[in-house]
Amino acid sequence: MLGKARELANYQDEPEQLPTGSFGKNAFLRLGFERRPERTVLATLHRRAPLIVQQALYWDEGMPTLPCVSIISNAGGILQGDRYAIEIDLEPDTQAHVTTQSATRIQEMDANFATQTQTITLGANSYLEYIPHPIIPHKHSRFVQQTEVTIHPTATLIYSEVLMAGRKYYGTGELFHYDLFSSKFHAAHTDGTSLFTEKFIVEPARGNVSRLGAMGSFHVFGNLILLTPKTHADRLFETIDPVFDMDEGIAWGASRLPNDAGLLFKVLGMESAPVRAAIRKIWEAARQEVTGASLPENFLWA
């Protein structure tokens, strides 16, 4: 059970408001994609507020048959005691793009914590881009996320997350004022073979996040996980050169994942825009390599 994670031991008190996981605080979303003769469709949609999806749209000019889904929240952010669950299922030979409507704000907390579980399943020759907007943890927030991926060896997943240091320009600034941010990602093949696990726990009060070897002088952390067949990963890896440019306030690098699972790309920056641009560059290259399709120009408001 995610709420029993060791890093949450000090945050088991109940909120004075709505109880943990009660109505309005136990969001659920299930997206099931299936192949039709002309395109992939969002065939299954189960939702429980505050997570909302209305329908799939086909706005991607580079891949006109790609269903694009935006996850919306009507809660104004993630609150203490919230328990979110997201399931994404791609049948064989399907393609999908999933994102969020805007940044995910983890609101200030004085009791308990919030969790989100993500379960992603990709069938043979399927392709998923899961590119949410940044996560902004507010002062004293506590958030734990666990992502479980089951992927066929012929499928591809482009998964990203961008973690802000907090509300950088709020008042005098909130840089690393949150209590806890924990994220675990585990991937396995459909036959049950475990590929790798990555977990990072950030507790600013317990250690200097700005030290060398952690964030250093940077304020934004970007993480892109590319699960794809080895031939794709090998070609992409050769095109990614490491960068460390303090004048521009950006640094990135790529490494290979264990068991020929794919690539891991990490980027640090001072602001979210350059970090997201670096992730978009790898996303674009991966899409071109795997599907042969181009990425459309970014929206002006993105």
From Swiss-Prot:
Transmembrane residue ranges: none
Subcellular location: Cytoplasm
Matches recorded under InterPro entries: UreD
A Pfam family matched in the record: UreD
Gene Ontology terms: cellular component: cytoplasm
Entry keyword set: Chaperone, Cytoplasm, Nickel insertion
GO MF term (any one): nickel cation binding
Similarity-based family: Belongs to the UreD family.
Function: Required for maturation of urease via the functional incorporation of the urease nickel metallocenter. Disrupting the ure2 operon has no effect on urease activity, or pathogen survival in BALB/c mice when inoculated by gavage, but confers slightly enhanced resistance to low pH killing in vitro.
PANTHER family: UREASE ACCESSORY PROTEIN D
Assembly and oligomerization: UreD, UreF and UreG form a complex that acts as a GTP-hydrolysis-dependent molecular chaperone, activating the urease apoprotein by helping to assemble the nickel containing metallocenter of UreC. The UreE protein probably delivers the nickel.
Protein name: Urease accessory protein UreD 2
Gene name of the record: ureD2
